[in-house]
Regions:
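Conserved glycine-rich acetyl-CoA-binding loop
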Residues: 71-88, 97, 101, 107-115, ...
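Short, solvent-exposed loop/turn elements at beta->coil junctions and helix N-caps
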Residues: 33-35, 127-130
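C-terminal "cap" of GNAT-fold acetyltransferases
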Residues: 100, 107-114, 130-146
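Acetyl-CoA-dependent GNAT
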Residues: 4-76, 87-89, 93, 97, ...
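Short beta-strand "wing" residues that participate in macromolecule-binding interfaces
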Residues: 59, 124-125
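Glycine-centered loop/turn positions within well-structured domains
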Residues: 66, 80, 138
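Non-heme di-metal
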Residues: 8, 120, 137-138
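Basic, alpha-helical helix-turn-helix
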Residues: 20, 103, 128-129
Length: 146
């Protein structure tokens, strides 16, 4: 599979809006993502396969750390390694920005994502009780070697 990555821009938002509406039932909306793109501390990438956006991910930089805001893969492209590739790109981006760590929050019941993050060296730091509509969330962190 030949994925291409690029920085997300405003022209990508219409296609991403369709992914958010059909495939992502969480709290991210078109307007939130648009605001994120206008924020200087936010960095978002898109994954394209044959010029179709099949996923995206983003971070917000806080001091010398990054918070992963989201990693989203279109439903009919899941379990193909795209999420893994997006996470690889995010880690490379954080390294290029000379950041010291990456943090994220993940639903306790999202076993696939938790396993992926652990494989990349993320460790659980704590729990946010009932953070996701009554479901606990894990706070995870990965240190970046400089």
């Amino acid at each position: 599979m030949n994925l291409n990555f690029s920085n997300m821009n405003m022209s990508d938002l219409e296609e991403i809006k369709d992914i958010l509406v059909s495939d992502f039932d969480d709290f991210w909306t078109y307007s939130i993502l648009k605001d994120e793109l206008n924020c200087s501390s936010s960095h978002y990438i898109v994954a394209k396969l044959n010029n179709e956006i099949v996923g995206f991910g983003g971070i917000k930089v806080v001091l010398d750390s990054a918070d992963i805001m989201n990693i989203v893969v279109k439903k009919n492209f899941r379990n193909l390694g795209i999420g893994t590739s997006i996470l690889n790109e995010i880690i490379a981006l954080c390294s290029s920005l000379n950041l010291s760590s990456i943090t994220l929050e993940v639903r306790k019941d999202n076993e696939y994502a938790i396993s992926l993050y652990k494989n990349f060296g993320f460790e659980t730091l704590g729990v946010r009780k009932k953070y996701y509509n009554g479901i606990d969330g894990f706070i995870m962190e990965k240190k970046i070697a400089k």
